[in-house]
Amino acid sequence: MSLSRAAIVDQLKEIVGADRVITDETVLKKNSIDRFRKFPDIHGIYTLPIPAAVIKLGSTEQVSRVLNFMNAHKINGVPRTGASATEGGLETVVENSVVLDGSAMNQIINIDIENMQATAQCGVPLEVLENALREKGYTTGHSPQSKPLAQMGGLVATRSIGQFSTLYGAIEDMVVGLEAVLADGTVTRIKNVPRRAAGPDIRHIIIGNEGALCYITEVTVKIFKFTPENNLFYGYILEDMKTGFNILREIMVEGYRPSIARLYDAEDGTQHFTHFADGKCVLIFMAEGNPRIAKATGEGIAEIVARYPQCQRVDSKLIETWFNNLNWGPDKVAAERVQILKTGNMGFTTEVSGCWSCIHEIYESVINRIR
């Protein structure tokens, strides 16, 4: 027989303490959704079952005890940290679910310069870890647009990819080791070693599991030298997307690794670069790192783009200004809410993966449907 809502709350309070179990209705409503439902959220409309409680977890041991209890009584759990997700994965679609909030597990455990690794609990905001590293001259190399909001556990659980992935890779390329708690409360740890010599890489069972298989409590990621003084910015306007895709392919095939490589169509370019796009497509690159490598990368980009006479370079300062305003923090989220209320319009980003041979066809098919 399943436990009642009240019984679930009472037993959770016994496990973690009453101060860590939140049952305020406003909080429960907010925690029944993620940013996929930002339009109804802005209008105060919540149609999903609200959770029985939100638990502010404080340690791996607490996560283990809570999951053991929930597993025994078949209670649905929704792991949550920064809550910046936009895919509906944080919704409490099952009655009397419990939201497992790890944002209070927010300690940076170790910054290991010799081994070029940083270890943090699941609730450490990426921006906090990044700032701590930058003070020492290092970086994670991971920079999704949600950097001011996202936290380390969620980034790994959702297989996050950042804006510098062409150079540094995605989160799955950065994770060295981790700690996680399975559904029955068993704590498992994957060691921080550079390579496994045999068997499947079990990190990839956990990375991207979306909270369905386990609760990630601790993460160790690679770190890199941070040298923003060497950043080189390149921006071009061009007539068509096909040319842009060809340029991107040539740069990658030649072995260059800019940290940023972006192509905007005319509509998107006009939205982001009204001051110079002039109704054309926009191609953007950034080279960074060791000054010799950055210089060689920049020269390679310029040489390849020069093979396409239709491309017109724009002032690098324009691209640098764009770069410095990429991320979405609380201020931009608040401003977006005001704009949605005012206009009734909103947008989402959809990520698509495709090979060089099909990516332009995918683009044309999608944009023709939209238009």
Pin down the residues of each PLM region.
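N-terminal flexible segment immediately upstream of the FAD-binding catalytic core
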Residues: M1-N68, T86-M116, A266-H275, T321-F348
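Soluble FAD-dependent oxygen oxidases
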Residues: L12, R37, H43-G77, Q117, ...
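C-terminal substrate-recognition/cap domain of FAD-linked oxidoreductases
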Residues: I22-K38, T243-R371
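Residue-level detector of anion-binding/catalytic polar loops
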Residues: I75-N76, T139, R257, C311
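FAD-binding subdomain of flavoenzyme oxidoreductases
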Residues: N106-R262
